[in-house]
Amino acid sequence: MTRIRKAIITAAGRGTRQFPATRTLQKEMLPLVDRDGITKPALQLLVEEAVNAGIEEVGIVVNAESEAGIRAYFGALTQQEAQWQNDRQLLYEQAGNLQQLGERIVTIVQQEPLGLGHAVYLTKAFVGEEPFVMYLGDHVLLSHTTKNCTQQVLEVYAHTGGTLSAVRRTPEERVHLYGTLSGDPIPDIPDVIHVTAIVEKPTVEQARASLRMPTLPDGVYYCFFGINVFTSEIFDCLERTITEGRTMKGEFQLTTAQQMLVEKSEYYACEIQGEALDIGIPQGYLEAQVALGLAGTYSDQLQHWIRERGGCEG
């Protein structure tokens, strides 16, 4: 099976739900204190996730306004920055790390906000004929095991091949926020299903009618996690979607192409041990920072700080 060398990150959204913080800052560049105690933009966490899973090249879909800032962030240290920093060792360590990451990165500009499907289609030349990993740029991934979320997905892909999406268990009152799917369990591979249906942000009634899974508790569904493995077939489906003008609220949806893949090829989904936190909304951003804090260098101090304030009692 072909080893996966490339990943794409979609980071061209306007971040309207995080306004006014995103007025001059791309939402994927919102800062978070990572588990190692270093403050980084969310986008860097995803690039590091990919590289640590063995990915060699990362294509980032950006908008025209954010491209220069993102490229500069992953660029070389400037003389002015060197003068500002007192801790020279930390400065050069982090600057060197950023430059190494930057050497793996290619930016791809989405000139108009035409949706996630359109953003993925723009990466066709970068990806070529290879299978690739796709990330949502406004998600922070936090593994609950020693292997990161991407490593878990790639281990499953080594058994399944084809198209593979990571999924998470989601209560029915939240399915309207996510692409939701169902399918048939695969007996020989735990926590993996053969996908038979995908619905973009279904109502509770739609989910109950067509997306129930016998292996899940009542009122719980599989929703997309934020990591997909695609083959070049996805571009054929996206091209058809775009050519036919199949939009939802003026945008080309990725799930439209994914539904086509379900009908024409092998499509799998796997439940992994971890969580994906959506920093595109205030609550998700706050949850991401708390989760990273509790899993990282400052965990003891953070827990002590919370206990001093009466824990989580309302």
What would you call each of these model-derived segments?
Residues 37, 112-116, 172-174, 204-207, ...:
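A short acidic, often aromatic-flanked loop/helix-cap motif at beta-alpha or helix-coil junctions
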